[in-house]
Amino acid sequence: MKVLVTGATGFVGSKLVDRLVNRGALVTCLIRKGISNSAVKTVTGDLTYPDFIFPDEEYDVVYHLAASWPGEKDKKILRAVNYDGTVNLFSLLKEKTKFIVYVSGLGVFGNPRNNIVDENSPIKPHTEYAKIRLEAQKFLESNCKELGIAFSVAYLGDVYGNGGWFKNILVERLKKGSFRLPGSGEYYRSFVHVDDVVSALESIIEKNAINQSFVVADSTPVTFKDFVNLICKELGVKEPGSIPTILAKAVMGGDFVNLLTTSIKTSNNKITSICDFVYKSYVEGIPATISEMKS
């Protein structure tokens, strides 16, 4: 199987690439800078400046993970990376692939109040970041349908594991005593371990789950405060204090803080019907992750 991955050097993308290679897939990565995996082909380029070409070959599937960080404050950059980059990618690949899997986030569901979010829930993004991600999704859906290209979308919960924001921002700052909870921390979040995200993305292809959407999160929504406190327990450090939401927005950006502090509880019944999660709950995943970091 030939696979193209965008965002291949990111937290999720790099793990996905490693798994695909181990499964025997022929993987090509679209990157802006070097990649350490010598077992893959690379195409160097920036989707916001598509002055490059892909090899003259077809891909069984394209995983589109490339996106800006939700904390990006410049709206022009948000649009250039998340929407324009997606349009440019499709233009380059529309005759080279049979299936596109778009990787998005739960932010597109906006504020569901007390409702449990699943694949049939209303899509009502309330941040600029999520609105642009949804716009890109709709572009792909429409154009894939027109050209007969299979399309599916994975809405990821907050991804944790040994790397990415979880390690480099949350864990490191908790260890230094410099992390503060935005607001009360009593808002619910739906987390998912990076290994289970990779398994879910694999399963969408293995089960040929075309033209569908999947909520990818574990089965135990938890308040951000309780999630952080469990990390502190495993690290053996003091639980953090909090800062007013308005101050957090000034530091981390309004969109990012709005996404983080909006309560969202999800059902993962659909994705777990085709994929077995290793860490069915953060209660299992956090101790395993912190143990891995210490080893």
Region annotations inferred by a language model:
Residues 3-23:
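N-terminal Rossmann NAD(P)H-binding glycine-rich loop of SDR-like oxidoreductase domains
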Residues 143-189, 194:
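NAD(P)-dependent short-chain dehydrogenase/reductase
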Residues 134, 147-149, 159-169, 203-214, ...:
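Glycine/proline-rich active-site loop of Rossmann-fold NAD(P)-dependent oxidoreductases
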Residues 80, 111-153, 158:
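Catalytic helix-loop patch of NAD(P)-dependent Rossmann-fold dehydrogenases
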Residues 87-128:
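Conserved Rossmann-fold NAD(P)-dependent oxidoreductase catalytic core, especially the SDR/UDP-sugar
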Residues 44-84, 92:
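NAD(P)H-binding glycine-rich loop region in Rossmannoid oxidoreductase-like domains
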Residues 204-255:
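Mid/C-terminal beta-alpha module of Rossmann-like enzyme folds, strongest
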